[in-house]
């Protein structure tokens, strides 16, 4: 429907209505139903719902509070710390791409992270063969879509839909990416091959994810299984790392008798309600 918005103004109005209706029903009205007598909202975290191992949140889902749109930011403002406290937000930057670099051993991707470069601009520079400082916003956006898409085993068709380009051009982006980072291609191929042989993948911490789809008699189901095999070790390891971080942060806060406390986990991000006098510690 989004593709029709430019040609038919009413479509844009319908999409805007849907967005506002979602914000109102799910957040403006929905969250108010979960406020307890203390004025707080408590979510429920689940360890075993997602296949990747990530924590999920329900009743209400506090991992999905909108942030990108201006109205979403206003909704976030209803959450505030206790008097004298403040929120400290810490996250693992580009954790899945960093894990891809580590697990594949691709020197170029590793070097880009070691130099603390804008990873999407770095990829665009290499894939499109232009100097780093001359990468355009469009080239960076395309490289970003490829960077994240590769982790999820994106197809040329899927990338073409994301970027609104032809399938042939999208395939060219993917081919150029693998020419730039050959060890990533090798890693993904080997990961899928091992998963087909064993029927499962492992995270770096040894957690197993069975992938029965790889032995399906249905071609589309097998393709889905291959995409799962590519992504599961990366996203699963990221999930393991953030859980370990949660334990370590909690234990240190207790051990050092801090008043600060861990109050929320949003995938690769931790939110701590921090006492003003403890914020530098």
Report each predicted region and the residues it spans:
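Conserved catalytic core of nucleotide polymerization and phosphodiester-bond processing enzymes
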Residues: 1-281
């Amino acid at each position: 429907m989004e593709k029709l918005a430019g040609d038919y103004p009413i479509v844009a109005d319908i999409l805007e209505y849907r967005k506002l209706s979602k914000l109102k029903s799910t957040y403006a009205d929905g969250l108010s139903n979960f406020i307890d007598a203390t004025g707080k909202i408590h979510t429920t975290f689940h360890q075993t719902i997602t296949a990747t191992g990530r924590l999920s949140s329900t009743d209400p889902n506090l991992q999905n509070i909108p942030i990108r749109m201006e109205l979403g930011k206003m909704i976030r403002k209803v959450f505030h710390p206790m008097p004298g406290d403040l929120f400290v937000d810490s996250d693992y930057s580009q954790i899945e791409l960093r894990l891809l670099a580590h697990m594949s051993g691709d020197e170029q991707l590793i070097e880009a992270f070691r130099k603390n470069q804008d990873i999407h601009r770095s990829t665009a520079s290499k894939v499109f063969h232009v100097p780093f400082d001359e990468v355009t916003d469009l080239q960076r956006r395309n490289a970003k879509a490829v960077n994240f898409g590769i982790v999820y085993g994106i197809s040329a068709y899927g990338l073409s839909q994301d970027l609104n380009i032809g399938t042939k051009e999208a395939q060219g982006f993917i081919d150029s990416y693998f020419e730039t980072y050959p060890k990533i291609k090798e890693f993904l191929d080997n990961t899928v091959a091992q998963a087909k042989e064993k029927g499962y993948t492992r995270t770096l911490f040894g957690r197993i994810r069975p992938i029965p789809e790889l032995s399906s008699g249905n071609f589309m189901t097998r393709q889905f299984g291959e995409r799962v095999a590519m992504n599961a070790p990366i996203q699963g390891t990221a999930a393991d790392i953030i859980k370990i971080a949660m334990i370590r942060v909690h234990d240190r806060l207790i051990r050092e008798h801090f008043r600060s406390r861990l109050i929320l986990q949003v995938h690769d991000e931790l939110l701590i309600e921090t006492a003003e006098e403890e914020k530098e510690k």
